[in-house]
């Protein structure tokens, strides 16, 4: 469907370069800072096949992030070369941990999240639970599948 939409936009006279740049190539400075911080502080397991990124509330404040900077950040760790399953933990204002897991085919994000009372599907799943960030990272690491 994306190609058909792009073709319709082109036929209608849309400036495709500007459209593409606005949708896919432009990030706020806050979002880029966040991505750098996540990579620097990520926990890589199973020879880089698994990554866990934890975002404490204090870091959001320290980096001066706004909600748009953090929106859909759960897909970012999965974009790291070689990563097959990625977990992002974000501490919400109420203190709960929001877990988002993304996986490539052959791995089950929902199975990881089910261990924390959550759900979803094999490619993307989530859960929210009460736990300290440090304990949550350890628990999520323990819940990850064995890599073959």
What is each of the regions a protein language model found here?
Residues 104-106, 133:
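Helix N-cap motif at beta-to-alpha junctions
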Residues 108-112:
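Short, glycine/polar-rich helix-capping loops at beta-to-alpha or helix-loop-helix junctions
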Residues 121-129:
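Short acidic/histidine-rich active-site segments
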Residues 117:
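Aromatic-lined ligand-binding clefts that engage carbohydrates, nucleic acids, or primary amines
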Residues 98-101:
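Primary mode marks residue(s) on the alpha4-beta5-alpha5 output face of response regulator receiver
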């Amino acid at each position: 469907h994306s190609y058909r939409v792009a073709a319709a936009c082109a036929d209608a006279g849309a400036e495709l370069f500007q459209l593409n740049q606005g949708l896919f190539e432009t990030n706020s400075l806050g979002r880029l800072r966040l991505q750098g911080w996540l990579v620097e502080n990520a926990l890589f397991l199973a020879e880089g096949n698994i990554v866990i990124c934890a975002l404490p509330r204090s870091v959001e404040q320290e980096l001066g992030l706004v909600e748009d900077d953090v929106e859909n950040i759960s897909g970012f760790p999965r974009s790291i070369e070689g990563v097959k399953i990625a977990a992002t933990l974000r501490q919400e204002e109420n203190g709960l941990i929001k877990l988002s897991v993304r996986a490539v085919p052959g791995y089950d994000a929902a199975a990881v999240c089910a261990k924390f009372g959550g759900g979803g599907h094999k490619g993307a799943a989530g859960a929210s639970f009460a736990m300290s960030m440090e304990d949550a990272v350890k628990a999520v690491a323990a819940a990850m599948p064995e890599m073959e």
